[in-house]
Design a protein with these regions (language model features):
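Non-catalytic C-terminal interaction segments of nucleic acid-processing enzymes
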Residues: 2-21, 25-39, 47-48, 184-192, ...
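Short glycine/proline-enriched coil/turn segments at helix->beta-strand junctions
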Residues: 56, 125-126, 199-203
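Generic structural signal for residues in well-ordered beta-strands
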Residues: 75, 137, 232-234
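Active-site metal-binding core of divalent-cation-utilizing nuclease and nuclease-like domains
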Residues: 78, 108-110, 125, 129-176, ...
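Acidic, glycine-rich loop-and-strand cores that form catalytic or ligand-binding grooves
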Residues: 120, 124
């Protein structure tokens, strides 16, 4: 089963927004552009350094790639916090990738979490087991879109990992829930979240935690019956997940 970004073909030609532009003509979008634009839609926004990893280019090339998107009216960029610039889709860019989600600068209060979830995704996608199992990432926005009403109970995780039913795959047919934790929550709240996820048909509940959040999540995961605790994997987030200056 392909990754999400390959499920959203982007029109290869896009007319520029104004006929008065000096480079009037059509901008040809390549596969890399499609991957990047769909990633921005899925993940709300992306900082340049992680976008470079996602596109498999040197970080200094991202500026030019984003400039092409911006000139085409598909994306916007800005300095939202200490560290690299950020990029996000415009409404035209969101329409281009085929979604009706909001297209706007990410809220400053959510930057750290958005960065951490994208870094977690890149971390998982870089693992050999991911490639061998042809796993794919189902983002929070897609999960929320699939549960539009109050008739769909249950905690919505930060993402799901879907493992297709490939013969010989140790994870064939499994669905994992992914939770990204940056700061410690009250123990009772973490236990309620884990309990809600255990009640859903997830084979694994994967917690990727910043160092500050690791102890409480580890403790909460150990407070369930052994067969339930065995479904909860607690791991440390990669250092790239943390905002500059974060502990």
């Amino acid at each position: 089963m392909p990754h999400h970004h390959s499920q959203n073909p982007v029109n290869p030609e896009l007319s520029p927004p104004s006929p008065r532009r000096s480079d009037a003509g059509k901008i040809r979008l390549q596969r890399r552009d499609a991957d990047g634009l769909v990633t921005l839609a899925d993940m709300y926004a992306a900082p340049y350094d992680l976008l470079a990893v996602r596109l498999d280019v040197a970080e200094d090339r991202v500026r030019g790639i984003v400039a092409r998107w911006r000139d085409a009216g598909l994306a916007a960029n800005g300095k939202l916090a200490e560290g690299p610039q950020w990029c996000w889709l415009t409404p035209a860019g969101m329409r281009q990738v085929g979604h009706g989600w909001e297209a706007a600068p990410p809220p400053l209060a959510r930057l750290a979490h958005i960065r951490a979830v994208l870094a977690a995704r890149l971390f998982m996608e870089g693992d050999a087991a991911w490639t061998a199992g042809r796993a794919w990432w189902r983002c929070e926005r897609r999960l929320r879109a699939s549960r539009p009403g109050v008739g769909q109970p249950g905690h919505i995780p930060d993402a799901e990992i879907l493992w297709p039913s490939i013969p010989g795959s140790p994870r064939a047919g499994e669905t994992w829930a992914v939770e990204v934790e940056l700061t410690p929550k009250p123990l009772a709240r973490v236990q309620r979240i884990i309990s809600g996820l255990l009640a859903q048909p997830y084979a694994v509940i994967l917690y990727l935690c910043a160092p500050a959040a690791l102890p409480v999540v580890t403790q909460a995961a150990g407070n369930f019956r052994p067969e339930q605790s065995a479904r909860v994997l607690v791991r440390t987030l990669p250092s790239a997940a943390l905002m500059r200056g974060a502990a």
